[in-house]
Amino acid sequence: MLNTTFDQYLEFPCSFPFKVVGDASETLADRVVAVVQQHAPGDYSPTSKVSSKGTYLSVTIRVTVTSKDHIETLYTSLAAIEGVKRVL
């Protein structure tokens, strides 16, 4: 797992924002939601924004997380999506 200190600063469960930046693709937001659904089923409405040159797309999604491990698992799973460059 990742070596994070989320448990020192957050009280669980809580709403946690994830921003996924990847190659511009019409399906990126759907793929992000599909991965989140595997780890935290729910009804999600992500927001997305295309970069100024149209090369990248950022998808922001808020997820109710239950632990530090839950956050780390989501970071790792989201980063594994094809075309994803960063997860913030």
Curated annotation (Swiss-Prot):
Residues passing through the membrane, by range: none
Top-level lineage group: Bacteria
Pfam families in the record: DUF493
Covalent S-S links between cysteines: none
UniProt record similarity statement: Belongs to the UPF0250 family.
InterPro entries on file: UPF0250_YbeD-like, YbeD-like_sf
Source organism of the structure: Shewanella amazonensis (strain ATCC BAA-1098 / SB2B)
The protein's name in its UniProt record: UPF0250 protein Sama_2593
GO CC, alphabetical: cytosol
